[in-house]
Amino acid sequence: GLLHFNTMFTNDVFFWDAFRNTLLLSIVKLILNTGAAVIISLLLNEITNLAFKKTVQTIVYLPHFMSWVVVASIFRLILSVNSSGMINQMLMGMGVIDNPIFFLGDVRYWRGTFFFINVWKDTGWGTILFLATLSGISPDLYEAAQIDGANRWKRLIYITLPALANTIITVFILNLAKVMNLFESVFVTMNDAVVNVSNVLQTYVYRKTFGSGNSDYGYTTAVGLFKSFVGMILVLGCNYASKKVRGRGIV
C-alpha cells in the first residue's frame, strides 16, 4: 500500500535516477521531434515539383512504420565499431576521429544518438499533419502579402506559422500524453554500460520485476501508478497553458 510509495520517494535512489532520465529523454525528444517535423514540413511545402515532393515525403514518413526492433538493428549495424559500421569508418577515413566511437555504448554519446534515432523514426508522422495544415492555407493570403511587400521570411512569420499554431499545439499535447512511455525505444538501444543515463521508469520496472530474483509486484505497481499520474499532470498542464494562450484547449 502506502508503504511502497514511502519507500519509493525516500529510500530508492535508483527510482529518482530513472525518473530524471524519463523526464529528460521524454521532453527533449518531444521538442526535437515536433521542431524537426515543423521544419521539414515547411521545407517540403516550398518544393514545387510534385513528384519529387511526394518521393521525399514518402522517404521521411517510411521509418514511422518500422518497429523499434528493426530500427535499433539498423542503427546498431551502421554505428558499429567494427568494419560494418559505416559511420565510424567514414569519420576515421575523413580524419575526424582516430578510434571508433561506441555511440550506443558510451554515456557521452548515448543520449545524442537516442535523440537522433527518435527524430529519424518519428518525425514523418508530424510532418504529414503539418503539411495537411499548410495545404489548407489560401494562396490569396500569400499573394496579398507579396503585393504589400512582404518577403518570404515575413510571410512565414505572419501567415504560415500562425496557421500552424493550432496544429503544433495539438500534436504537442497528443505527444505529451505519451511522454512517459519510453520503454520500447529505450529498451532496444540501452545496455548495461549506459544504464545510468538510459534507465527510465518503464525499464526500471521491467528490471525490478523480471531482472532480479526478488520481484516485488506491489512496488512496481506503485511506480507504474506514479508514472501515470505524472503523465496526466503534464497533459492537463499543457492543456491549461493552451487555454491561456489560445483561449481554448483540446481536452
Give, region by region, the residue ranges found by the protein language model.
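A structural signal for multi-pass alpha-helical bundles of membrane permease subunits
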Residues: 2-251
